[in-house]
Amino acid sequence: MKKIISTGKGQISRVTGNRRLRSKLFLLLIVTCGSASFARAQGGNLIDISGQVVDQQNKQALAGVSVSIKGSIAGTVTDDAGNFKLRTKFKFPLTLVFTSIGFQPQEFEVKSIESKLYIALLTQTNLGKEVVVTASRVPESRLRSPVAIEKLDIRAIRESAAPSFYDALENVKGVQMTTSSLTFKVPNTRGFNIPNNFRFMQLVDGVDMQAATLGVPLGNAIGPTELDIASVEITPGAASALYGMNAINGMANLLTKSPFTYQGLSFYHKTGVNHVDGIDDAPSILTETAIRYAKAFNNRFAFKINIGYMQGTDWRSNTRLDQNTNNLKSANPGFPALNGANNVAFDGWNKYGDDALAGSNVVSLSGLTINGNPNQTLRVARTGYWETDLVSPRVSNLKFDAALHYRISEKAELSYSYRIGNMSGVFQRGNKVRLDNVVIQNHHIELKGNNFVISGYVSIENTGDSYNVKPLADNMDLYSGGATDTKKPDSWGTKYKNALLEYATKNGGGLTDANLAAATQYAREQADASRVKPGTPEFNQLKNTIIKINNWDIKSSSIPDAPETGGAALVQKSRLYHTEAQWDLSSKVKIFDLLIGGDARVYEIIPDGNNFVDFSRPIDDRNKPEADGSFGANIYYKKFGSFAQVTKTFFDEKLKLFGSLRWDYNPEFKPKYTPRLAAVYTFKENHNFRFTYQQGYRFPALFEALSYVNNGRVKRVGSLPYINEGLGYLENSYTQQSVINFNAAVSAQGNTDEAALANRNLLVVADLPDAGPEKIVSYEVGYKAVLLNNRLVIDIDAYSNQYNGFLGQVQVFVPKGVSVGTDAAVLAMLDRNRDATTATSTTAASQGQDRYRVFTNAKNTYHNFGSALAITYNLYKKFTVAGNINFNEMKANKTEDIFVTGFNTPRWSTNLSFGNREIVKNIGFNVTWRWQDSFLWESPLVTGGVAAYSTLDGQVTFHLPKLKSAVKLGASDIFNHRYIQYAGGPTIGGLYYVAVTVDGLLK
């Protein structure tokens, strides 16, 4: 039954159904006779509807209230006086929808013309009742979403104690943030965290923000500014069923402000200071500025422009721990005199060129007599350089975006948007990369109706002046200090060995435990004599030369065509073409809701001859330029997909069932089908129980699939099987760990050929499979409730994931010219046979070995599980306390795999916040305490423990309504408790800032 209120010549009614009760609780509609506002018929069947919206509590006009017509894209916003005017071709009855931050969204049915509307909205807390679109690709209540989903709206972003909306993601239930740089932060959910997170998708208004060859979004480098962000929706866990192959760990969708709804000129400026303790750098100023302007004309055409610039001094990665301690087989466990600070195989967390653990910068000094024992061998690492000497701490991000919107009709809107960002910072995958003048561009065109979306975009990537830190350190050492081996009289290894023997002769006549530490220290000093020293003009000149050369090899007898100094430049250029469409057929099917969609994506890589090559060219020519200067034909990597989702409610809408099926095809692999089944049951309106089953797949990212780069004489190769042709690393190689164990055993037995053949059983054949997509099977249960008269929200979920074919990297050793298992292959695995050797009186000749780091699938199945609980409670008036606690665990496997997967997630983490958006008139505050447990971080670059830490963030905001301004005074990590978020990552401390926002000028 509808409740009709007489309004003179017209009528207006409340929409019936379940909204009726909520209307009484959260919204008061007062319709009075007057002359200020009206609806009237126009020529050409146009209707003008106008009115005023005020706050019922204080009768003040409400500016910025969104007023739209249900079932269309037509809408407007109220002006500073709360007035609105809307022209439409719709016929009566029609439904108006009013939404505003802090007020319950509500629908009203206008039944006839000439109604005079005066609307007063009742301020109410809206805990837990947000509308989200990401979980099912259609608007729905967050309480009844089929999967876990979190949302930060404008109010939550403004009130957050974090210094930016992007930093605020770290306080969301289930989210773990990894900070590689001030300009580069990477969110993740539900385990297997890495700084280059291929498993977590980030969208801006539905557009994938990834830099294609790097494989991940560069933080918020081309994302929204603080002025243009409207909301953020985060889906922890698999979202592949509707969004495709990259979202098996989760996704974030950053939604920006419509120029129709949010008009005028806005300004934002933040000034902060970090490094206040002066440990890693002098106290440094950070600034961020943004400007936004948006304007709509006749509610038909609108545009917006955003520009933002941020600059500061980065957090420094300078942890001087050793990850290759002397008790490991990759060091010298037989010589305890070399323990601790005396470790000659030192491999520092943030040092490069000393990569003893990976075996790429190690010389094997054989034939030594130590403690009177002949034929002893020492493994000695090159000295290398610290990251702080190789990477500038200055970072910046300049970004611009603009959008044009045109409402073709009341049911269709066409828009074009352009984004560009230039950023510098630090990125980590297998090694650290200094990003410098990286430019990402995005062109997006979209046609959107009330039941369909057609979208297409192209993203353009150029890594600019970036460089890889490891080849920089390697080549600086090799060029100025000499080759690593001991085969040449002027090599670093020969100089080290000669100095070692010289010291022994002058100090007792031999090497013993008593003088071994001093002897190796002296030998390093002598071998390093010609090496360029940080801070000198020679160092800077050599560095500047190397980082501009896009060839990471260095000239040698085996690579005569390589540059004299070697190079380290990261030159990657690509384009990503994407188109997609979805159509809501619910109004046509009637018996259930049906959503269908499809997409196509093409990556285009311009080969640079170093990171990406044209595989149609002969192996020996792939790194050489052609006559026109190019490195061959462009490389294409494609994916196509489609999906269908059915939704049906039962039992008076208490039970809601979801079923979806997605099909994805990449020409390099077999097609994959991704199902999702979910059920949501609502009990007594406020209690919602959820169960979800889904599968997901992930095709290898571009670098995982197609890379072909020599880095420290270890070639990184993609997972596609045809790359193996002529190289043999899949079927003719030994695992790295088995080679380390083999060499340790042989060294302990005199480092002879006989000892090598006697220990051949220690070598393990890698036997790598043809790589395929990664698969996840996920189960999830959840409960959401709004209790105590809308003052308490409880949100709890639990999940269980099973990964098959987990993608990662394994390093393998290929014996040149011979087959694994033969005597020649065994001898080729000796450290002294890294390169081809000739026969001596005691050793056989060897063709040497090649080393590859291969992207491939794990052989084990991995099972991780966890749970998260979030509670929000409105204590008293506007005081709110909120918190979440998160548990994540991975089940241990009984057998070791060919590579370490790296769960890289704390078992326990928690956030607790307390605040009041208006403790006194126009002043609000919020404080957030965050803690996470210690955990083990494992990666190809650094493996080590990450200590537990806690931080306290806080902010006080002063609102100046007459000036349309707000001043936010805040700090993250108030007490400057220094911490790291991952092994090898930067040390983070306190950031103290003041931010000024001026909003809504020149409307």
Predicted regions span which residues?
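Short, acidic, small-residue-rich periplasmic hinge/interaction motif at the N-terminus
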Residues: 46, 50-58, 65-70, 95-103, ...
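Extracytoplasmic beta-strand/coil segments of soluble accessory domains associated
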Residues: 87, 141, 149, 166-211, ...
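Short acidic/polar hinge/loop motifs at secondary-structure boundaries
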Residues: 85-87, 207-238, 291
